[in-house]
């Protein structure tokens, strides 16, 4: 049976989720996650406490509880549950207060709220990634921070969206399709922005598996076609001196981190 995990916050619970996922990913076992944001009143906290306690009674195992709760009175209710508490704010804030010699001034929703100065940049970047996904248009390439290239289904779209959502980076992406293979070359708008180009490639066998789930038993998803497209696009990357990475067996977080590391791009937000 999967171990029950709760991610709780009086805000969005994004911080608790990121913190918890980072820790639990180190353990080779299954977890059943429940995320509960906006626990802003004692009544809501008591309801969450009951949910945690019910889980303990049902499973016989104390649930893992990752939380980032600003209000002390809400936090105390969660502390009194049968869960095993992992408090992000108290774990790191108290030692920092000692080192910095300054008391923290917690503000609810500050981390991910609209008041954050990077909010507008994040929204602009997300909109840009969606409008410039999969080569829909080449009109805005001059405004892109980075342009991801690769064959269809190699991870361009999720990587673009992750870069925009997590770091506020305006990421466009452009696919090379079967129709491009006879005379594979960069469109003029991409040539003009060659310093922004970054390639993604993938193992042909893995690519076939992904394409089969979308268009089973088609030419598009045949191993022969996948091998040919990957080979041609990698040759073009080398010819044009476009840096690229293999996305096979890498998560979108790892892909994005490798892109940032190799390009030296500045993260617009943290």
Curated annotation (Swiss-Prot):
Specify which residues bind ADP according to the UniProt entry for this protein: 150-157
**A molecular-function term among this protein's GO annotations:** protein serine/threonine kinase activity
First-tier enzyme category under EC: transferase
Record EC number: 2.7.11.33, 2.7.4.28
Q: Which reaction does it catalyse?
A: [pyruvate, water dikinase] + ADP = [pyruvate, water dikinase]-phosphate + AMP + H(+); [pyruvate, water dikinase]-phosphate + phosphate + H(+) = [pyruvate, water dikinase] + diphosphate
Task: Name the protein family.
Answer: Belongs to the pyruvate, phosphate/water dikinase regulatory protein family. PSRP subfamily.
Question: What is the role of this chain?
Answer: Bifunctional serine/threonine kinase and phosphorylase involved in the regulation of the phosphoenolpyruvate synthase (PEPS) by catalyzing its phosphorylation/dephosphorylation.
Q: What protein is this chain from?
A: Putative phosphoenolpyruvate synthase regulatory protein
Query: What organism does this protein naturally occur in?
Result: Shewanella amazonensis (strain ATCC BAA-1098 / SB2B)
């Amino acid at each position: 049976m999967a171990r029950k995990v709760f991610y709780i916050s009086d805000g969005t619970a994004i911080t608790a989720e990121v913190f918890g996922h980072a820790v639990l990913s180190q353990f080779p076992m299954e977890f059943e996650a429940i995320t509960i944001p906006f626990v802003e009143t004692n009544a809501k906290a008591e309801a969450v406490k009951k949910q945690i306690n019910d889980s303990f009674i049902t499973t016989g195992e104390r649930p893992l509880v990752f939380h980032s709760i600003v209000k002390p009175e809400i936090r105390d209710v969660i502390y009194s549950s049968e869960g095993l508490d992992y408090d992000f704010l108290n774990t790191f804030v108290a030692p920092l207060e000692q080192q910095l010699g300054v008391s923290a001034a917690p503000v609810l929703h500050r981390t991910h709220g609209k008041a954050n100065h990077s909010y507008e940049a994040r929204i602009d970047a997300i909109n840009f990634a969606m409008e410039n996904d999969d080569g829909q248009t080449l009109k805005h390439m001059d405004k892109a921070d980075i342009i991801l290239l690769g064959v269809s289904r190699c991870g361009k779209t999720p990587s673009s969206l992750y870069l925009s959502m997590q770091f506020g980076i305006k990421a466009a992406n452009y696919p090379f399709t079967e129709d491009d293979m006879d005379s594979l070359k960069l469109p003029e708008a991409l040539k003009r922005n060659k310093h922004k180009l970054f390639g993604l490639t993938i193992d042909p066998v893995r690519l076939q598996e992904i394409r089969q789930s979308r268009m089973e038993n088609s030419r598009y998803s045949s191993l022969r076609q996948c091998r040919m497209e990957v080979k041609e696009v990698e040759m073009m990357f080398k010819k044009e001196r476009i840096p690229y990475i293999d996305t096979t067996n890498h998560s979108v977080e790892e892909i994005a981190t490798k892109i940032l590391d190799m390009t030296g791009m500045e993260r617009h937000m943290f």
